[in-house]
Each structure stands twice: as C-alpha cells, then as structure tokens.
Amino acid sequence: MDLQSHIRSIPDFPKPGILFRDINPLLRSPEAMAEVISQFGRICDQVKPDLIVGIESRGFIFGAPLASDRRLGFVPVRKPGKLPGEVVGLDYALEYGTDRLEIQADALEHSPRVLVVDDLLATGGTAAATGQLVEQAGGCLVGFAFVIELEGFGGRRALPAGQPVEALLRYG
C-alpha cells in the first residue's frame, strides 16, 4: 500500500514557509492504519520489545494498537501533571526553552525491552528525551519507530547512537 498517498501536504501551516505533513487522511483510512501497524509489527519482529512506549499524543494513536496487535503492554509518556501516582520525569531543551516528559514510576519495572513509537521525527528532541526517560525509569531501549521522518531537521543525529531508528515515510 502507498502510505504516502494518505499524507496531505499543506503549505504555510501553521505559519508561512512551513509545509505541514497532515496524517489525518491516513488516520481516516482503516486500510492505511492497518498497514502502519503491520509495518511497525515487522519492526517489533526485529527488535523484540516487551513494551511499546508512545509519546504524547500521536504516539498513542499508533503505539496502543501496535501493542494490542503484538500482545504487548503499552506505556504512555506524557506532559507534566497528566499521569496519576508517582512519576519519573525528565526536563529537556527545546529551541527556545525547556519542556518536561513524565512516565509512571512503576511502568518499566523488571527492565523491559522498550520500543518508542511516535508519528513524526523532526529535530529528535522529544524522541531523544523519551529514550533517556525510558532508561532512567528502568527500561531497556531497543529502538524507535516513526510514521514520518522529516530528514531536513536531522532528528536521527539527536537519537542514541546504535539504536535502530525506523521511519515508514521520509521527506527531505
């Protein structure tokens, strides 16, 4: 299936000069969604995770069905104040400031093998921070899977060296 035909390019959104890659047509297509989950499943076959970690919020859209399909657990990584109970958090640098991600403190007990899933890899800052958070919380990071990679932003360079990084679609 041609997943690229399910991605809409919207010029000048959210501001002039930006070419936005809209995944909503893909989300509306049961066949395209099934193909994404199938291709992510092949990545799981390679890296053999015990858990899928999804990055807020679109990582949830792809990570939860992948986990269900592969009979794996799913763990959300969220912005501050969104998870109940004790959390482990990590502050990370943005272009203009900082942000924070959190995971429940007991989510990665027993050092599970973790695949991080999200919709988009651009600068890599959020994904890299998620990988650090997984390890800080006791998990064993085994790779990253993205629907789209915007190669011009160099996000792969921000991710840990030696970790598998897979993107189903790449744009320059």
Curated annotation (Swiss-Prot):
Compartment(s) where it occurs, according to its Swiss-Prot or TrEMBL record: Cytoplasm
Keyword Glycosyltransferase annotated: yes
E.C. number(s) listed in UniProt: 2.4.2.7
Protein's name in the database: Adenine phosphoribosyltransferase
Source organism (scientific name): Synechococcus sp. (strain CC9605)
The protein's assembly and partners: Homodimer.
Family matches, as SUPFAM superfamilies: PRTase-like
Glycosyltransferase as UniProt keyword: yes
Role noted for this protein: Catalyzes a salvage reaction resulting in the formation of AMP, that is energically less costly than de novo synthesis.
Catalytic activity: AMP + diphosphate = 5-phospho-alpha-D-ribose 1-diphosphate + adenine
Keywords: Cytoplasm, Glycosyltransferase, Purine salvage, Transferase
Protein family per UniProt: Belongs to the purine/pyrimidine phosphoribosyltransferase family.
Annotated gene: apt
